Amino acid sequence: MVKNSFISVIPQEEKEKNKGSVEFQVFSFTNKIRRLTSHLELHRKDYLSQRGLRKILGKRQRLLAYLSKKNRVRYKELIGRLDIREPKTR
């Protein structure tokens, strides 16, 4: 699997400056999720990878919840750029 197979939606200059920003973290978690998902399509019984995927999904969900509370406009923009569904509300 080639690491650079995913299209970058964040320009290189922004990556260098904002590695700790919520948007960058969500972006990197999304790339990891896509990589693990494609891995699990081939290796269905890789339970450690399934556990890692669930952990990363939870982290991304918490970061997205934080961003939606703090700045709804940036949240909507990020969801649109990364092509992520909005989580269901209870």
Swiss-Prot record:
InterPro entries: Ribosomal_uS15 (IPR000589), Ribosomal_uS15_bac-type (IPR005290), uS15_NS1_RNA-bd_sf (IPR009068). GO terms for biological process: translation. GO terms for cellular component: chloroplast; ribonucleoprotein complex; ribosome. Keywords: Chloroplast, Plastid, Ribonucleoprotein, Ribosomal protein. It comes from the Eukaryota. Part of the 30S ribosomal subunit. This is Small ribosomal subunit protein uS15c. It comes from Liriodendron tulipifera. The gene is rps15.
